[in-house]
């Protein structure tokens, strides 16, 4: 018999893994109070209630039932707010961090001068950055997105810097010999070499941003998943906390499965 490839049967393995996790969850309830660790059926009921109950505000109206649930429910709107903030902070940090990383990787004098700044940025607590941004710019969307970008830029810059520094000088000389413009050199020389580093920084940064955005919403916003966690924590509604958690994780896994993994496979195709 031909052995299964990693892609074949992988779906069944993931399903069995989720079923095993659900079984462990139900068994763990025996050791805890149901109020502290509710049954999955209670979490499902809380999810349906949150998904079908309108929040204090609505995004927009739609006649389609699916989009009605997404846009008119508190769950759908809060997920939308959080995803927008995370996406804005992510793309801002990727652009700024990539530019900084390329410059540091190609110009050693800049790298030596700003190396201490990068180390400081990498070790600066995310919560401190968030509090300072809220103090300086108010409890606004701009302050939250700025805090997300500041926390992620050093990570992107470090990874892209390593890629830019590893580009062979001969390739740059060839580009100059063929009199390529700076844009053509960037597109034909730098970007193909840096693509794996872009993907590594994107995946690492995305994992970081998902965690930070919830904390910043918890302490300084009036919409979003983090803000809902604050309300449910105050009311000790554990099943609703878990309902929002599983919903958020599901969205993150969809992004990872259908966007990040295909792009990552493209980045590492040359290794096959």
Annotated model-derived regions:
Residues 84-118:
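Transmembrane-helix boundary motif in ABC transporter permease subunits
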Residues 146, 150, 182-216, 239, ...:
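Transmembrane alpha-helices
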């Amino acid at each position: 018999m031909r052995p299964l490839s990693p892609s074949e049967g992988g779906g069944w393995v993931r399903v069995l893994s989720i079923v095993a996790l659900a079984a462990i969850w139900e068994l763990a309830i025996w050791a805890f109070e149901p109020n502290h660790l509710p049954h999955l059926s209670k979490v499902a009921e809380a999810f349906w209630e949150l998904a079908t109950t309108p929040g204090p505000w609505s995004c927009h109206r739609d006649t389609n039932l699916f989009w009605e649930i997404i846009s008119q429910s508190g769950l759908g709107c809060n997920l939308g707010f959080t995803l927008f903030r995370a996406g804005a902070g992510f793309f801002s940090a990727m652009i700024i961090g990539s530019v900084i990383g390329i410059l540091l990787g190609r110009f050693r004098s800049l790298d030596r001068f700003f190396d201490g700044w990068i180390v400081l940025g990498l070790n600066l607590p995310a919560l401190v950055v968030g509090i300072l941004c809220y103090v300086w710019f108010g409890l606004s969307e701009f302050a939250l997105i700025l805090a997300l970008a500041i926390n992620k830029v050093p990570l992107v810059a470090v990874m892209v810097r390593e890629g830019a520094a590893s580009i062979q000088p001969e390739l740059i000389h060839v580009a100059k010999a063929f009199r390529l413009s700076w844009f053509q050199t960037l597109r034909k020389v730098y970007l193909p070499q840096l693509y794996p580093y872009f993907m590594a920084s994107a995946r690492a940064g995305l994992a970081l941003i998902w965690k930070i955005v919830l904390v910043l919403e918890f302490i300084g916003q009036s919409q979003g998943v983090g803000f809902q966690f604050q309300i449910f924590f105050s009311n000790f509604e554990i099943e609703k906390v878990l309902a929002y958690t599983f919903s958020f994780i599901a969205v993150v896994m969809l992004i990872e499965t259908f966007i990040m993994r295909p792009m990552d496979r493209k980045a590492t195709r040359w290794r096959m």
